[in-house]
From Swiss-Prot:
Disulfide bonds: none annotated. Its EC number is 2.6.1.81. Pathway: Amino-acid degradation; L-arginine degradation via AST pathway; L-glutamate and succinate from L-arginine: step 3/5. The keyword Nuclease does not apply. Transmembrane segments: none annotated. Pfam families: Aminotran_3. This is Succinylornithine transaminase. Catalyzes the transamination of N(2)-succinylornithine and alpha-ketoglutarate into N(2)-succinylglutamate semialdehyde and glutamate. Can also act as an acetylornithine aminotransferase.
Amino acid sequence: MSLSVTRENFDEWMVPVYVPAPFIPVRGEGSRLWDQQGKEYIDFAGGIAVNALGHAHPALREALNEQANRFWHIGNGYTNEPALRLAKKLIDATFAERVFFCNSGAEANEAALKLARKYAHDRVGNHKSGIVAFKNAFHGRTLFTVSAGGQPTYSQDFAPLPPDIRHAAYNDLNSASALIDDNTCAVIVEPVQGEGGVIPATKAFLQGLRELCDRHQALLIFDEVQTGVGRTGELYAYMHYGVTPDILTTAKALGGGFPIGAMLTTQDYASVMTPGTHGTTYGGNPLATAVAGKVLDIINTPEMQNGVRQRHDAFIERLNTLNVRFGMFSEIRGLGLLLGCVLQTEFAGKAKLIAQEAAKAGVMVLIAGGDVVRFAPALNVSDEEIATGLDRFALACERLQTGGVPCG
C-alpha cells in the first residue's frame, strides 16, 4: 500500500531549496493536469519549457516502455543503439558533427565551458581562459555554470567562484566588445534570456558576437536549453538569426519530460576532448535517448514548427485582448511559445502573486523574475486549451486588478 503524502510532508522531509505550490499534481494528459483533489489545471508552465509534447504523450510512453523492456543502463564503457540513433538525428538536423550526452542543461553547459577552456589550452595556451557571459543570464546550478550566469543572487553565497568570468550587458554589443579580447576562450549566450525576463536577442547582437568571437578566436556557445527543440518555431533558435554557434547546448524539451541533456559541436572542437577528459555515468542512457529520439521525430517537422508559429500568434492575440481589458502589462514579448508579459509599474514585483492566483483559477504559469509572467506551454497545445487557459488567467488578472488580491 502506497504511503499517503501531503504538501506539508515536503517541508518535513525535503531540503528546502524550493517552495512548491500548495497542491500536488498526480496525473497529466496533454496540456491538462489533475491534483490530489481532482482539480483540473491547464498547464502553460510545461515543467519550465520541458514538456514540449504535453504530459503522457502516447508515442513517448511507447518508446519508453519498449526500451524499458530491453535494458535500462549499461554505462559509458559501452555504447547503445538509441544513443547512436539520437546523435545522428541531431547531427543531421543541425550544424553539429559531434554530440556529448548528459542528463541536464547545467551538465551540458558545464561540458561546453570545459571544452572551450580545453580547446584554448591545447591550441593557444593557459592564458586564453576568459569567459564572457551576460548579466541576468542563467546557465545552471553547478559552481561553474552558476558563476557564468549573471545573477549574483544564485552565486554570491558560494565563493570563491571560478575565476576569469566576466559579464556584459545583454543585447549591448558595445558592452560585450569591451570585454572580449584575445584572452577570451568563449562567449556563452542565450538567444532568448529565459530566467532573465524572456528577452529575445537582437539579430545584430548575435551577429556581432559571432564577428567578435571570430576576430579573437573565441568559441561562441549558444545555450539553447530553454529555446531548443522547437520552442521558438525553429528546431533551434540560432536558425532564426542566421548565426551558427561553435557549441550548442540543449536539454529540457529534448526528452519531453525525461531527463537528458546534450552538447553539440564540430569535429575540430570535439577532438580535444580525448578519453578521460570528461564523462558522465548516466549520460546517453538508452531510456533517455530512446524517448528523445521519438521527441525529435515528432517535433522536427514543418507541420509542428508551423503550428508553433500559429499558436504564438493565438497567444499574442489573446494576451493583447486581455491587456486591453486590464492594462496590466507594459510589454508582451518572446519567440514562439516562450512568452513573457512584463508587468506595469503599478504591479511591479507581483508576478509570483499572479502565478499563484492563476493556479487557483486552474491554469499554471511561470515567472521570470518579479516583474514578468512567463508562458512555456506544450508545443501541441490546442486552440481550445489556449482559450480556456487564458480565460482562467484573466480571472487571476481581474482579482489582482480589482483588489480581490492585495497589490500593495
